[in-house]
């Protein structure tokens, strides 16, 4: 997800290689679908950038070409639809199968995720 950090738990995968390795272990247990969040490699902050999603998806497709891949299009940190939809512009086997684009208002523990009325 977007919230856990290495400070909160050392077990959260935040780097591309960590995410891919965790998905591989889950595939070995029999998953057929995965929901991904991407992080900036240096800051480990959540990101919408398709280039980072491409690295993750490409790594997964090497060992699980039929796995259904859903990417986060969260508006919690990035409000513009162009940013949120960026991973959907990937092509070929790097294109995700699904994207979770939540357009409603969501209440979280410490904050709310709000969308502009024009996006609703």
Regions found by a protein language model. Name each.
Residues 10-18, 44-52, 114-118:
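Alpha-helix N-cap and loop-to-helix initiation/capping positions
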Residues 28-31, 96:
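A structural motif
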Residues 1, 34-36, 67-73, 97-101:
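Hydrophobic faces of well-ordered beta-strands that scaffold small-molecule active sites
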Residues 78-120:
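Extended substrate/RNA-proximal surfaces in nucleic-acid metabolism proteins
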Residues 21, 25, 51-62, 86-89:
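Alpha-helical scaffolding segments of alpha/beta enzyme cores, especially the outer helices
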Residues 7, 32-56:
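Glycine-rich, proline-tolerant flexible connector loops at the mouths of alpha/beta enzymes
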Residues 19, 26, 37, 99:
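Conserved, mostly hydrophobic/aromatic
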Residues 1-20, 72-83, 110-112:
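Active-site mouth loops of central-metabolism enzymes
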């Amino acid at each position: 997800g977007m919230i856990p950090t290495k400070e909160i738990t050392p077990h959260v995968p935040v780097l591309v290689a960590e995410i891919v390795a965790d998905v591989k272990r889950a595939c070995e247990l029999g998953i057929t679908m995965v929901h991904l969040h991407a992080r900036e490699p240096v800051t480990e902050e959540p990101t919408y950038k398709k280039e980072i999603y491409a690295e993750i998806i490409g790594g997964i497709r090497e060992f699980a070409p039929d796995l259904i891949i859903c990417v986060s299009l969260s508006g919690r940190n990035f409000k513009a639809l162009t940013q949120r939809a960026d991973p959907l512009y990937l092509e070929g086997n790097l294109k995700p199968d699904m994207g979770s684009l939540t357009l409603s208002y969501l209440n979280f523990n410490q904050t709310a995720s709000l969308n502009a009325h024009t996006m609703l």
